[in-house]
């Protein structure tokens, strides 16, 4: 079974995808760099978790 992500991660990721969908890709490293530019995220761990969820969602949307 997979891991369950917190609501904060899901909500933030979905808002960012709606705003900046054309900037995100299916590559985790690229999404991490985009997040650094686009959003004000306090910790590296939170940034990585949001980037991972965005990557997951972008793969589903293709």
Curated annotation (Swiss-Prot):
The gene is rps17e. SUPFAM superfamilies: Rps17e-like. Belongs to the eukaryotic ribosomal protein eS17 family. The keyword Ribonucleoprotein applies. InterPro entries: Ribosomal_eS17 (IPR001210), Ribosomal_eS17_CS (IPR018273), Ribosomal_eS17_sf (IPR036401). It comes from Methanocaldococcus jannaschii (strain ATCC 43067 / DSM 2661 / JAL-1 / JCM 10045 / NBRC 100440). One of its GO terms (biological process) is translation. GO terms for molecular function: structural constituent of ribosome. Keywords: Ribonucleoprotein, Ribosomal protein. GO terms for cellular component: cytosol; ribonucleoprotein complex; ribosome. This is Small ribosomal subunit protein eS17.
């Amino acid at each position: 079974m997979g891991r369950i992500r917190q609501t904060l991660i899901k909500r933030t990721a979905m808002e960012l995808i709606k705003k900046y969908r054309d900037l995100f890709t299916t590559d985790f490293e690229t999404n991490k760099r985009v997040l650094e530019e686009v959003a004000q995220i306090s910790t590296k761990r939170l940034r990585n978790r949001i980037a991972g969820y965005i990557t997951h969602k972008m793969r589903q949307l293709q």
